[in-house]
Amino acid sequence: MNSKLIRFLAVLIAFASCGFAFAQESDSNKNEKLILTVDDAVNYALKNNQSLKSAAIDLEIKKRANSYSWNTFLPSASLSGTLARSNDIDTIKSSIESSAAFPAFLQGAAVRNDLKDGLDAVGYVDASKIIDDMYGSEEAALWHPVGNLSFSWAFNAAMLKSISATKKQYEAGLISWEQSVRETEVNIKKMFYGILLAQENLKIQKESMRNAEARWHQAEINYRNGTVPRLSVLNSQVTYENMKPTILSAENSLKQTKETFGFLLGLPYGTKIDLTGTIETSYVDVNADELFKKYVEQNNEIKSLKKNIELIKTGIDATYLSTFTPSLAVSFGLQPTVSNITKNWFDKDNYSEGGNLTITLAYSNLFDMLPCSSNMQKLKDSKQQLAQAEIGLEQLYQNAEIEVHKLCDNLTVSRANIEAMRNNVTLAQEAYDSTLKAYNNGTQELLAVRDSESSLNQARLGLMNENYNYISAVLDLETKLNITLK
């Protein structure tokens, strides 16, 4: 009994150890941070973003439709089998009695003595006895298996335009997919750098809070040395305490932004993210006129609208062809019918072959050619939609030119601002260091330190914001022209 108890306890301890190890591993995985560069973030988004996955399905649907667009030329075919029963035996008897082939049948049958019971003394037919000899019973004579195999095929010149339209729809889908990918990349990059900016802002605020704490403690030292009044200590402490709620709010906002960023990357909720990188940027030389002339045709909006114009034109051509050209229809059918259900169904003497072949060339509706018909009115609507699309294309070119010049101007101004702000940060840092040193020596008021630190923080944040603006302008320009600037 003791040995069993010992074994049971050993097993229980082993399970507990495994569970503890698993719990430790789960906690470890949960606490692990995913370290991402901007390129890593983009790759995660392209692989896992739900919107892109949905767009990929749309593209796959259009790709498959384009690959098999030729199936519009396939004929339709049907195969059926019917077991038909007649409700009128008298009709069958009359058919037997009046059959032109029946005398020959009787002659052969009389020779064989197969149907001698079906003839009376003067040679008239007894149809009931003949049916019994042929089918075995009147019920069997009522049943007839019938097969049916039919093919039909139709063609109109508009079908060729339909195939062309399917191809253009797939090409439009490719443009839309490329646009979705580009927009995802840009949004992820902007959000990535936006988070870096928020992190730097939080870092500056925490540094300011540490400085405020240091000034508070320095004020206490100065108070004990008798160089400053008690009010200076209290003011320093209040300044320090007032910073805590602001920093807590900034930390919470940054946490929520990272969670949203993780969702856009397709990461599980709760995944901790650590972004690595800087908001510093390398400059690019741009010439608005050259960029517009060279790359405007690569603009995804322009390419998409051009493809839409092609689709409208294809639809107009298809309407013309379906209206003013005839349609060809070919139909072929076979209908074998078994004569005697009790005999071999595949015996060529036991079934009759029915069927037909028809070839038709026709206009579906002549009234569709009339100018007042709904068909022609729809055609006019399509032409006006085409005119609107062409006007929209001209506007896109104009807007693209304006945007390219605007973004290039923004880059030039932003670049100049960055250079000026870098110098300003250097000066603000020197001013703050001097003011802080004087405050620690008791020759400057706390207000002067606050003003100096505020100026330094504004200069640093301004520089980071301007760097972010420059990066955003580069990304917008790359998106507008669908290129990568180097």
Residue ranges and their predicted role:
Residues 53-57, 70, 139, 154-181, ...:
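Sec/SRP-type N-terminal targeting helices
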Residues 23-90, 95, 167, 269-310, ...:
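Bacterial Sec-pathway N-terminal export signals of envelope proteins
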Residues 2-5, 36, 175-298, 410, ...:
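Periplasmic alpha-helical coiled-coil/stalk elements that build and connect Gram-negative outer-membrane
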Residues 9-18:
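Bacterial N-terminal signal peptides
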Residues 223-227, 439-443, 480:
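A short glycine-centered flexible hinge/capping loop motif at secondary-structure junctions
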Residues 4, 24-31, 85-91, 96-104, ...:
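Acidic, low-complexity, intrinsically disordered peripheral segments
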Residues 29-33, 80-155, 276-283, 317, ...:
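Small/polar, glycine/serine/threonine/aspartate-rich low-complexity segments that form flexible
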